[in-house]
Amino acid sequence: MTTLSSINLSIPPHLLPSTTNTCSSSSATSCSPPRSSSFVLHSPLSFGHRRLPISKKSKLRFCGVITKEAVSGSNDMTITQVREDDESEIDAPLLDPESLSKPRRIALFVEPSPFAYVSGYKNRFQNFIRYLREMGDEVIVVTTHEGVPEEFYGARVIGSRSFPCPYYQKVPLSLALSPRIISEIARFKPDIIHASSPGVMVFGALAIAKMLSVPIVMSYHTHVPVYIPRYTFSWLVKPMWSIIRFLHRAADLTLVPSAAIGKDLIAAGATAANQLRLWNKGVDSESFNPRFRSQEMRIRLSNGEPEKPLVIHVGRIGVEKSLELLKSVMDKLPEARIAFIGDGPYKEDLEKLFTGMPAVFTGTLQGDELSQAYASGDVFVMPSESETLGLVVLEAMSSGLPVVAARAGGIPDIIPEDQEGKTGFLFNPGDVEDCVTKLRTLLHDRETREIIGKAAREETEKYDWRAATTKIRNEQYSAAIWFWRKKKVHVLGPINWLIKRLFPVPEGNV
């Protein structure tokens, strides 16, 4: 009988999944996967020339797999259901320390540019590149061509000619499948390709990964099916989900910024639960810090009335952010002032909506100005229901601001139910009265505001970009490579079987 270990067309035997049953008959019950709590990878791998022992404590150390409970459970799924210390019965293949210490060659396809386009994932990718380079990895970045530097922390950056998104002109898109880019990536010889999704460039990244026979990881950052009804036609939602399913089923691993988004992808059939991982939160606690509080900035944000209660919103100003809700909220808080920091296609309309009201629109701020803007407010508000995580919420908390945000998308991953009222407040999406009640509590009670702001700051100090990057590099990329090798085995197995029968080896020559 042909075994996986007999396949030798292009994969060395020591890189194949072991077919040894690690469960004895007496322990079969304990080795069976619980019906409603876990997905099981049945075969550990041998890496190098020795088999790696896998202890129960290390079962999920490399990933944090989303369990079936995350799919079939209630809508109150939280980050705790995607955690490192999950006790599900999973054999996690781990690379040995020697393999992990070797530099990797990583090709990143990011659309739009994390260098020129202001968005929530800009800091995520910039810090990711920075810490990969600090770990000694070689990195090449393919992105849209506007404002692209030649290099970033030693990583080479390639700009691909882009075009504006038809329904969102400020978002540049690019297929990144020109002969020049294919040639550059082929010469680079990546160990793994990582592409942001959804978008147009991810198709180019997938094609190149297949051409070069390289594992591909896709990280999901923009919940486009939620945006579509606000920008185009609702009937396009189903075709969009079909595209997302096509892309992520072709990926070797999918990364998501929050458990809630992971749940949506699994429910839509876009990926298998055991091929989904969480990209851990991170925040630059030095750049976003209460020490940046500035009276001068507060005067600017309050339009010359720094003694008035000041509400802050930071982020892209788009119709999908539900910012029109804040008009009704501020109508009920006439004593307060509000400042919008950011730019976007909805800015002009929002300014018209707030005509005659005590609202300031600063446009895009960066560097110390942005740090000062965060730290100089009293409360941060986030009405958006479409956030895959909400990095601006983390930045506000790191700046010592209490947050009032919609209980939607990835926000409950940042302020879980057991932390509501301690590190921030969540309100029911679209509920003006609920939002007003929680804002008023904070705006008029300085002591409560300071206690929650301090607790929020302490909470965000747990989140570190270096640790998040290390986890992806050492554990989640390793998982992607393992799934990719496993997929190749499944493809080559029937071919190997056919060759053995067409060209049998005489017994005397074995």
Curated annotation (Swiss-Prot):
Induction: By phosphate depletion. Repressed by phosphate (Pi) and phosphite (Phi), with a faster suppression in roots than in shoots. CDD domains: GT4-like. The keyword Coiled coil does not apply. Catalyzes the transfer of the sulfoquinovose moiety from UDP-sulfoquinovose to diacylglycerol during sulfolipid biosynthesis. Sulfolipid contributes to maintaining a negatively charged lipid-water interface, a requirement for proper function of photosynthetic membranes. Sulfolipid may also function as a substitute of anionic phospholipids under phosphate-limited growth conditions. Pfam families: Glyco_transf_4, Glycos_transf_1. Its main location: plastid. This is Sulfoquinovosyl transferase SQD2. The lineage of its organism: Eukaryota, Viridiplantae, Streptophyta, Embryophyta, Tracheophyta. Its EC number is 2.4.1.-. One of its GO terms (biological process) is cellular response to phosphate starvation. The chain crosses the membrane at residues 198-218. It comes from Arabidopsis thaliana. Residues 1-83 form a transit peptide. Pathway: Glycolipid biosynthesis. One of its GO terms (molecular function) is UDP-sulfoquinovose:DAG sulfoquinovosyltransferase activity. Disruption phenotype: Lack of sulfolipid leading to reduced growth under phosphate-limited growth conditions. GO terms for cellular component: chloroplast; chloroplast envelope; chloroplast membrane; plasma membrane; plastid.
